[in-house]
Amino acid sequence: MLKDESTSKSENPFLIWYFDGETMFEDIVEASENFDDKYCIGVGGTAKVYKVEIPGAQVFAVKKLRSTVEGIETENIKSFTNEVAALTKIRHRNIVKLFGFCFQEEHSFLVYEFMERGSLADMLCSEEGAKELDWATRVQVVKGVAYALSYMHCDCVPPIIHRDISSKNILLSSDLEAYVSDFGIAKILKPNSSNWTTIAGTYGYLAPELTYTMAVTEKCDIYSFGVLVLEVLMGKHPGELITNLHYSTSTSIPLKDVLDDRLSPPTSQKIVDELALMQSLSLSCLSAAPQSRPTMRSVCRQLEMQAANN
């Protein structure tokens, strides 16, 4: 029922339940008072997320599948198994950790590490949160997501495509480090397969080619990453700007025109240079032609070279 036997009990107190799924189940149900809404911290299309604190252990985020009187819907089961399949294959500091899962008719849920600051989307929507996300922090958020995607695309065999990179699926820790979450529609690319699928993801982040082809590739994530980077720079979704880019022959946009005006302009030349590079990378990731978009490995390499040169 639980995974990650390699982690020591001192590092992960949740592991004490590895061999006793019934105890784990009972403790979570008890701590959440049978998943009372007062512990709910988020609602998605297929699940609710609860903040659950187990006595003597740490705080966890528990994602509970929605169910009906007929049981769990087929689509929800698919999302559940997708998430388990993806997260049991990967380990990266910028990808949220799955500690365990339970699949039962009454309650089916996944147990993750809890991210104290919630989603990047919520932080950017809040005046106070946006100001707390200063320019240096935003640079680190972008790098964290880039490293996670590069790992998934280039270091996992076979590669894993997230398919729903958006600000609501980037979670922030207490020190505002970025973690990629929600692998419910992730796809593991199978060799010698067409990897065709139905369109899925968050409107406003979907690669344009998905309107005429069902083939999922790394380039779909890269387009979504481009949208996300502009959103981090601007402090809001860059919908109108992207539309203008697709219909314009020029991709030259002054940096000052895309920076969140809730923050004071950056004064450090190092930060200015990093923000300018991120703007440039985001525009290349948003190319209408998938083959023209860079790989995530290339994106990370350029970010690292910029940091080294400063």
Give residue ranges: language-model regions.
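Conserved alphaC helix of the protein kinase catalytic domain
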Residues: 39, 85-88
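Conserved N-lobe motifs of Hanks-type protein kinase catalytic domains
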Residues: 44, 90-93
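Protein kinase glycine-rich loop
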Residues: 38-49
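Conserved beta3 strand of the Hanks-type protein kinase catalytic N-lobe
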Residues: 52-53, 65
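Conserved N-lobe loop of protein kinases adjacent to the ATP-binding glycine-rich P-loop
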Residues: 53-60
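Protein kinase catalytic-loop region centered on the HRD/HxD motif
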Residues: 147-160
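Cytosolic eukaryotic protein kinase-like domains
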Residues: 1-29, 60-85, 96-143, 176-310
